């Protein structure tokens, strides 16, 4: 929000946060670390129930803390989804029967396994990004130079994936 509203010229955060913010920001460099995947998941013991609920209700109920990304993904697939915005422990949505599925990020899959959830769809991969305010990119050469230097540094680095991570 600081960068999008002009309080800062540039920043670093995950691709997921940039997309979900909906702000007009320029992603200049994929920093290549902090890898995770955006996934759709459901309880393993309720396999097929979401499709039956969709046929009966005409919509899929989905818990997420990323409503913009989830809505866009379902819309791109022609699926009507009722998005339930939750903050923290979204995996409980389908476990307690409040939703059919979840959309969330995962790096190792540990939380999914702990809650007996299985991946039913992969939405996108995310890594940390260097991003800038478009106005700052046009007006301040230091912002562009910083982006160029980061891009050059990333080319020479090699991040080893953490065991069990999304990479």
Protein language model regions, located:
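Domain-level signature for soluble enzymes in the chorismate/prephenate branch of the shikimate pathway
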Residues: 1-167
